[in-house]
Structures are given as C-alpha cells and as structure tokens.
C-alpha cells in the first residue's frame, strides 16, 4: 500500500535566473511542472505508530542544476520559494487527510533544477532545515523517546527526461519523486510480557531509556551523505505499547519462521540518522527498563555491541528483557517491504 503526495513545484516568475534577468522576465517561458511525491507506507500499514502519517508537513527547496557540471552539491543560489511560516526561504505545505498536497508554481522552460523534499510533523522540534542543503538533527529537541513525531521523510531529485536522465524542463513536464526515511528505526521488543505480568510486574507502567553511540547529526540533502558523530541518550519515556490508545505491539514480518507475524511488547522506539553507505555500519546500543518513571524503578540494563543500523530499515532488539538478562536477538527489517534479515 502506498501513500501519494501530489506536489506541483517550481520557481515563481518574480525570481531571476542566470539566463533570464529581471528586465527580460516578461519574455521568459514558464511552464507548470507537476511532481508526484510518493512515500511508501510502513510494513505494518494498519498501525498508527510509524505509519508515516505524522510526517504531514512538506518543505521543499528548488536549486539550479548544471547539466554539464560533475558536481552540483556546491549550490550558491536557492530559487527562493515563499509560502507558509516555517522559513521564508522554503515553501511549507500541509497535507490533507488523504496525505495529498498541491502547490502551483512555475519553472523556466529550458532550465534544469534539483529539488530537496523534506516531510515531517510541524510539532517536531528536533530538525533544523533553515539551510535546506544541510538538515541538522537535535537529539535533545522537543520530542522525547518513543514519540512518533520524530518520523520524517526525505528525497533529493533532479529534473529528468522519459529515460530518467537529467534533463531540462519542457512543456507538460511531470516527474515522480519517492521519499524515504533517512533514519534507522530502533525498536526494543519484549517476548516475555505475559511472563512478566504473571510474575507480578505492572506492565502498564514500564518505561525505557536508550543510548546509541556514534550517531550522525547532519544530513547533506544534495548528495545524501551524513556527518557529525555523537553518543545520543534518549530520555526515559513510557513504553510504546502502553503509550498508545490501541496498546500497539511490535509486529515483525520475518522470513524466519521463529519471528514471522509474532507480536512483542513494544518497549522503545527511536529514530537515528545513519549513512546510506556503507550498509554494514555498526553502533553500540544500551537500553534500560523501569517499572516506573524514576531511577529507583530500574529493572534491567541491556547492552548490545556492533548492532547494524541501515537507512530506511528497522532494527529490532528482541528477547526476554523483562524477566531476565538473557539473549537479545537482532533483526533487521526493511521498512517498506515484506521481508526481514535475521542474524
């Protein structure tokens, strides 16, 4: 199942271009270019957590693109679009209930462009996109651990022809852009929720914290690379399973029969920025579980070293984490498809 965002975007006639100066503007050829922005849904499409619907505000920027250049990442000129109130240098669009939005503006015929699309929840205070070429992540921002408002989607695209090659804008220009999460989603799942409850633990008050080492904090939106490195500690929060109206559990669609369609107590969920390559980047993760919201309520602290985190994948830490310090299994699940990698 896919969610489709419709976006028609371009530079308005009030702006000048290298070959279209202000005094020649009335002679410039402008065309309306239509972009279909597609954000694939999460594998658990019926769930409210991590289904992508919280990323309801779209910000985009338009930059010139030189078809003859070998590097278009050193952009000096932002084609300045103004709408909404997020930042005067970007256009912000609120999607409707069907996750669709349309902006009508124009591009100059015969010019090539590149686009940065960023979709997030407007209430998420953890992303700084004042420079749309370098989006910064604040892991101590307004959104706490286990809160799906951190979910966001990103894409960089260039105007292309029917053969998907970089090209100039022509009449009737249209293009599809696919958004992906630039993050890895880290989840902690308890296989022993029932056993813990039978042993007298009040599973309705379970809280968790998490620390992830060596996390990037800047996304270069023009080439997809990341930079920065910090050890990120997410503050204590109520378990996802207990903090949702539907008492959602972590469901894993794994090829491995031991995990296929099983449900686990969803104790923690966090998004961290990771590189698209190399695909085998590893991080050390520590998470602590509490039967209340104070340090004195600590149950267990678990650590897992060299955990693989992949962009646009979900990494699950699964085990009997509430009743004993035992084996924690690591599963890597590609976020928008129906199979898992288990090791």
What are these language model-derived features?
Residues 20-343:
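Extracytoplasmic cysteine-anchoring/structural motifs
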């Amino acid at each position: 199942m896919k969610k489709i965002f419709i976006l028609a975007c371009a530079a308005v006639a009030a702006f000048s271009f290298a070959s279209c100066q202000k005094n020649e503007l009335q002679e410039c050829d402008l065309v309306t270019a239509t972009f279909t922005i597609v954000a694939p849904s999460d594998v658990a499409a019926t769930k409210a957590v991590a289904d992508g619907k919280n990323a309801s505000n779209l910000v985009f920027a338009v930059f010139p693109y030189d078809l003859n250049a070998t590097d278009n990442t050193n952009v000096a000129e932002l084609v300045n679009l103004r709408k909404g109130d997020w930042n005067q240098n970007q256009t912000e669009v609120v999607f409707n209930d069907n996750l669709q939005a349309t902006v009508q503006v124009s591009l100059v015929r015969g010019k090539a462009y590149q686009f940065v699309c960023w979709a997030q929840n407007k209430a998420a205070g953890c992303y700084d996109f004042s420079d749309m070429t370098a989006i910064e992540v604040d892991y101590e921002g307004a959104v706490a651990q286990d809160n799906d408002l951190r979910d966001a989607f990103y894409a960089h695209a260039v105007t292309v022809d029917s053969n998907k090659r970089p090209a100039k804008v022509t009449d009737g220009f249209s293009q599809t852009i696919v958004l992906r999460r630039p993050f890895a989603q880290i989840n902690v799942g308890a296989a022993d929720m029932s056993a813990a409850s039978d042993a007298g633990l009040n599973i309705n008050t379970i809280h968790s914290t998490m620390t992830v080492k060596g996390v990037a904090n800047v996304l270069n939106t023009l080439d997809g690379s990341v930079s920065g490195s910090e050890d990120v500690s997410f503050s204590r929060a109520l378990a996802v399973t207990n903090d949702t109206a539907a008492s959602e559990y972590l469901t894993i669609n794994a090829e491995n029969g031991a995990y296929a369609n099983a449900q686990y107590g969803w104790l923690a969920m966090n998004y961290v920025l990771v590189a698209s390559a190399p695909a085998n980047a590893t991080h050390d993760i520590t998470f602590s579980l509490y039967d209340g919201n104070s340090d004195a309520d600590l149950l267990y602290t678990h650590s897992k070293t060299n955990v693989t985190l992949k962009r646009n994948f979900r990494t699950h830490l699964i085990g009997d984490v509430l009743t004993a310090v035992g084996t924690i299994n690591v599963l890597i699940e590609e976020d928008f498809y129906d199979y898992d990698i288990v090791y």
